[in-house]
Design a protein with these regions (language model features):
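Alpha-helical transmembrane segments of integral membrane proteins, especially early/N-terminal helices
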Residues: 30-38, 67-74
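Short, hydrophobic transmembrane alpha-helix segments
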Residues: 32-39, 55-61
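Hydrophobic/aromatic-rich structural module bridging two neighboring secondary-structure elements via a short loop
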Residues: 45-98
Length: 215
């Protein structure tokens, strides 16, 4: 799959590969469709997960690679929940209604997130340094990366359950990614993150309108 590494163009003196461009396009399309309450976002999401799997495999980012089956499972759950809602959760169109977490559920999620991030960060800090040396590249920022990863999985899960709160999680992910990319001196990915951010803000208000309409 060397053709995935074809340089499409350069931006800020850095090459943008075909795999980077495709993953950005499919990722943006997925959240764009989700923000507009389209079930087709899951089909694009399957392609996006496959592209990320290939990209992480080629770049030897095995910590990210092993999370893709989890993302795939969340995507399958989301497609089922959106298409086959319980009668009490069904909208007028027959799809899953937009709902919100209760304050108790939000408190639980906020308490769980740092615990999971610390645990996953510790595991990743061991990979390549004490465990599987030579197979897993050591991560210089394991805890920071794992905080973002846990946020992404949380946002995906909430989106699969069609919770309005997912867009707050996505906005936090976008802001964190934008900061990391800018600090790394990247040009293409900050632009992509800004597009994610704009879509996240729009979707936050769009889903709130749906929630109020379907109450």
């Amino acid at each position: 799959m060397d053709w995935f590494n074809t340089i499409i163009f350069e931006l800020g003196g850095r090459p943008v590969l075909l795999i980077d461009l495709l993953s950005a396009m499919f990722g943006l399309t997925t959240v764009f469709l989700a923000g507009r309450n389209r079930k087709s976002n899951f089909y694009v999401g399957y392609m996006y997960t496959a592209l990320l799997f290939v990209m992480f495999w080629q770049k030897n980012l095995y910590a990210n690679l092993i999370l893709q089956p989890i993302s795939l499972g969340i995507n399958i759950l989301g497609q089922y929940r959106w298409s086959q809602p319980k009668k009490s959760q069904e909208s007028a169109s027959g799809d899953l209604k937009v709902s919100m977490l209760s304050w108790g559920q939000r408190t639980f999620v906020l308490a769980l997130l740092p615990t999971l991030a610390l645990l996953w960060g510790w595991l990743m800090s061991m990979m390549g340094t004490r465990w599987f040396v030579g197979y897993f590249p050591a991560n210089p920022l394991p805890y920071l990366d794992c905080c973002v990863t846990v946020l992404i999985l949380t946002a995906q899960t909430l989106s699969a359950l069609k919770k309005w709160d997912c867009w707050i999680a996505w906005l936090l992910v976008n802001i964190a990614n934008l900061t990391l990319y800018l600090k790394a001196g990247l040009v293409f990915m900050p632009i992509v993150s800004c597009l994610y951010l704009v879509n996240g803000i729009w979707s936050l208000f769009s889903w709130y309108k749906l929630y109020r309409h379907e109450e």
